[in-house]
Amino acid sequence: MFTMKKSLLLLFFLGTISLSLCEEERGADEEEGDGEKLTKRALSILRGLEKLAKMGIALTNCKATKKC
């Protein structure tokens, strides 16, 4: 029982250290990639607006020609 507690404590300790290292790396990556994320988000918004505009034009054309 005592050895099991020691091994569980060791696993918990190592997991905590590894988690904190991952969080530090992620934080550094996020700082570098903020501009890149913003660009990707802007492009995805523009693509969505483009699709919306195409649908609007198609619907307007359909209503105008009465071929719906």
Swiss-Prot record:
Disulfide bond sites: C62-C68
Endpoints of the signal sequence: 1-22
Subcellular location: Secreted
Source domain of life: Eukaryota
GO BP terms in the entry: defense response to Gram-negative bacterium; defense response to Gram-positive bacterium
Stated family: Belongs to the frog skin active peptide (FSAP) family. Brevinin subfamily.
One Pfam family recorded for the sequence: FSAP_sig_propep
Swiss-Prot/TrEMBL keywords: Amphibian defense peptide, Antibiotic, Antimicrobial, Cleavage on pair of basic residues, Disulfide bond, Secreted, Signal
The protein's name in its UniProt record: Palustrin-1c
Function: Antimicrobial peptide.
